[in-house]
């Protein structure tokens, strides 16, 4: 009988001291299950607020890594470099875990599993529900990633890098809402400006696609060279989709149309479903972006 998985909860914090206590407490109060809570780490990325005082209140139950600000990408990278568990559960300090998160994820693990994602409850800055139903996850606080597999993808600049494990067929998707994802003005930076969020996502997908191509000569244990090629094209295709949406949000319809052929080529090379390409094509023909922007946090919606 195999030993229960050791899980490290790593909280990423930059000036989120007002929310940090709830994040730490949610890790400390996880329901028991077939896992070992290896450690709770708080990476304080140059905070100048009450973060230090909050961490002091939990002294003895958490490990604190405090340093000058290095940004989200390096902090997420360090979450895997500095942890010691078999699995890592990253948590943005303004979010918090459901008490059953680790137990539920541990129960879902299979021999080949390297990546688990689950749904989330979207709440406002005070913790009040913003949506009637749970929302699909995929962001930092909704993931559980096998540390050894993650190390092969480092350094990262966004959690999307770990989605490569899912595309390699080594992931599990749960519909259980096991994270409370907090939406507030600081977390919505640049999401209401046409094209900005989509361009950022496109840049991340291109960086990941390039990384996967660079891994061809020495493929990781979780993917063959052929599979890496397909996954690389998958993320390059996603980048095309984000660029199309960015152009449509900025009302640059001609620019969007010019990207449509490249998105189709990428779709075919990735052997991916054609539905996303058809949606982008329909969007450009209709002259309407797929995502409707608003200046109110949490109300960005798909048309």
Where are these regions (language model features)?
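Glycine-rich, basic loop-to-helix element that forms the pyrophosphate-binding segment
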Residues: 67-83
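Catalytic core of nucleotide-sugar-dependent glycosyltransferases
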Residues: 181-185, 190-222, 245-246, 253, ...
């Amino acid at each position: 009988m195999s030993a229960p998985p050791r899980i490290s909860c790593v909280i990423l914090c930059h000036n989120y001291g007002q929310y940090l206590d709830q994040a730490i407490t949610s890790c400390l109060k996880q329901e028991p299950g077939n896992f070992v809570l290896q450690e709770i780490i708080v990476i304080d990325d140059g905070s100048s607020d009450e973060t230090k005082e909050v961490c002091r209140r939990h002294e003895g139950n958490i490990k604190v890594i405090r340093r000058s600000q290095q940004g989200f990408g390096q902090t997420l990278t360090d979450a895997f470099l500095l942890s010691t568990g078999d699995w890592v559960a990253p948590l943005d300090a303004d979010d918090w875990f459901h008490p059953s998160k680790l137990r539920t994820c541990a129960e879902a693990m299979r021999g080949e599993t390297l990546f688990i994602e689950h749904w989330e409850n979207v709440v406002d800055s005070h913790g009040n529900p913003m949506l009637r139903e749970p929302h699909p996850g995929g962001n930092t606080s909704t993931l559980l990633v096998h540390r050894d597999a993650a190390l092969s993808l480092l350094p990262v600049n966004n959690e999307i890098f770990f989605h490569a494990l899912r595309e390699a067929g080594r992931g599990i998707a749960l519909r259980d809402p096991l994270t409370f994802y907090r939406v507030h003005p600081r977390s919505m930076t640049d999401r209401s400006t046409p094209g900005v969020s989509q361009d950022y996502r496109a840049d991340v997908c291109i960086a990941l696609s390039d990384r996967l191509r660079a891994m061809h000569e020495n493929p990781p244990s979780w993917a063959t060279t052929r599979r890496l090629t397909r996954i690389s094209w998958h993320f390059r295709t996603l980048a095309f989709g984000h660029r199309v949406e960015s152009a449509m949000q900025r009302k640059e319809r001609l620019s969007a149309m010019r990207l449509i052929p490249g998105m189709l080529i990428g779709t075919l090379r990735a052997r991916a479903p054609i539905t996303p390409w058809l949606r982008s094509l329909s969007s450009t023909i209709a002259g309407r972006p797929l995502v409707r922007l608003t200046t109110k946090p949490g109300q960005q919606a798909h048309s």
